[in-house]
């Protein structure tokens, strides 16, 4: 019988990522875990609908037994079974992030007995979670280099706080893992500005694009008008394609916040990324930790290791025989993964 891993949900940044990573790793390794103090660092601690959906999805996919799976719960015991591929559908029932639920269960399906399709309904454009276009255009090309083949499709947008969006991912079992080396970003090839509108006047998008164009040489710019019933909502994104990596940054518009202020937030974030030669942005770094750990080797550079990143690394090291080493040189942190030997 495998040992029970005890996790403190209050460690590090004390958010939901500790739970999501633990669920993924438990399904993959077969190791059960207990987590207490779930989301202790948040204003509203405990399981929200999004986190509960992730728990229920993980439970269904690996036929786990679970204790504490209810709204507001701050303690969970998860004992995984065998991961099985198939066609799965999960509904969050709020504007909670579809991509964060997918992020929880897809790694386990890389080890399933056959191909799978997972469809999640909820929020697609959420200020605190990566949108589907980030997964599709930034993360999945890097996963393919590691040997992980999955394809995400956004079927319907759902903006915070209403939700109603749908995202689906098709995934195949991994035959073998490759190592990923992301040392330098390289020269910028082109930059693309993109705005989504649903039930919002077009001039909002035009002003957002103008603000981006005032700071960066946009090679391409797009305005997408979505059906009104998918809103109201507005997201502005900027994609930076460099020689060795493509990064994408976004800001979700808010009521009573001007188009110029929304776009200026994005400009600030992109400038922070470009100020360093590091290849990987803050949010992508979080997404790379688990797949690169499963490969057992690799490295990437990031300007500043976030508390979120360090917390995620700590959880991964509890489940997998790997060690992460962080080395800072000239304002760039190199994150290196090595496999531990018995």
UniProtKB/Swiss-Prot annotation:
Pfam family name, one: RTC_insert
Top-level taxon of origin: Bacteria
Binding site for ATP: 103, 283-287
Enzymatic reactions: a 3'-end 3'-phospho-ribonucleotide-RNA + ATP = a 3'-end 2',3'-cyclophospho-ribonucleotide-RNA + AMP + diphosphate
Active site positions: 308
SUPFAM superfamilies for the chain: EPT/RTPC-like, RNA 3'-terminal phosphate cyclase, RPTC, insert domain
Major localisation: cytoplasm
Keywords: ATP-binding, Cytoplasm, Ligase, Nucleotide-binding
EC nos: 6.5.1.4
Described function: Catalyzes the conversion of 3'-phosphate to a 2',3'-cyclic phosphodiester at the end of RNA. The mechanism of action of the enzyme occurs in 3 steps: (A) adenylation of the enzyme by ATP; (B) transfer of adenylate to an RNA-N3'P to produce RNA-N3'PP5'A; (C) and attack of the adjacent 2'-hydroxyl on the 3'-phosphorus in the diester linkage to produce the cyclic end product. The biological role of this enzyme is unknown but it is likely to function in some aspects of cellular RNA processing.
Family: Belongs to the RNA 3'-terminal cyclase family. Type 1 subfamily.
PANTHER family membership: RNA 3' TERMINAL PHOSPHATE CYCLASE, RNA 3'-TERMINAL PHOSPHATE CYCLASE
Protein name listed in UniProt: RNA 3'-terminal phosphate cyclase
Native organism: Shigella dysenteriae serotype 1 (strain Sd197)
Gene name of the encoded protein: rtcA
């Amino acid at each position: 019988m495998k040992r029970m891993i005890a996790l403190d949900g209050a460690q590090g940044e004390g958010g939901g990522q500790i739970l999501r990573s633990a669920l993924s790793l438990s399904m993959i390794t077969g190791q059960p875990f207990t987590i207490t103090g779930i989301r202790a660092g948040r204003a509203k601690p405990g399981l929200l609908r999004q986190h509960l959906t992730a728990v229920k999805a993980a439970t269904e996919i690996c036929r786990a037994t679970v204790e504490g799976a209810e709204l507001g719960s701050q303690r969970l015991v998860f004992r995984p079974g065998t991961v099985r591929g198939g066609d799965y559908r999960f509904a969050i029932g709020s504007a909670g992030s579809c991509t964060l639920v997918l992020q929880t269960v897809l790694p386990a399906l890389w080890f399933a007995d056959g191909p799978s399709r997972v469809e999640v309904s909820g929020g697609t454009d959420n200020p605190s979670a990566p949108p589907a276009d980030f997964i599709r255009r930034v993360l999945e090309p890097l996963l393919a280099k590691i040997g992980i083949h999955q394809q995400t499709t956004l079927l319907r947008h759902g903006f915070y706080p209403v939700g109603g969006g749908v995202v689906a991912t098709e995934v195949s079992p991994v035959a073998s893992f490759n190592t990923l080396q992301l040392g330098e970003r390289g020269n910028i090839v082109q930059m693309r500005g993109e705005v989504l509108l649903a039930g919002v006047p077009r001039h909002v998008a035009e002003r957002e694009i103008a603000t981006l164009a005032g700071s960066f040489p946009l090679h391409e710019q797009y305005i997408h008008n979505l059906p009104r019933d998918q809103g109201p909502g507005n997201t502005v994104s900027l994609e930076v394609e460099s020689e060795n990596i493509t990064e994408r940054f976004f800001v979700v518009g808010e009521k009573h916040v001007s188009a110029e202020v929304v776009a200026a937030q994005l400009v600030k974030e992109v400038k922070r990324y470009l100020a360093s030669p590091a290849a990987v942005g803050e949010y992508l770094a979080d997404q790379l930790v688990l797949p690169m750990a499963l490969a057992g080797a690799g490295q990437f550079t990031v300007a500043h290791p976030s508390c979120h990143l360090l917390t995620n690394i700590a959880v991964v090291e509890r489940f997998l025989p790997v060690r992460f080493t962080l080395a800072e040189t000239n304002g760039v942190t190199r994150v290196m993964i090595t496999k531990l030997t018995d």
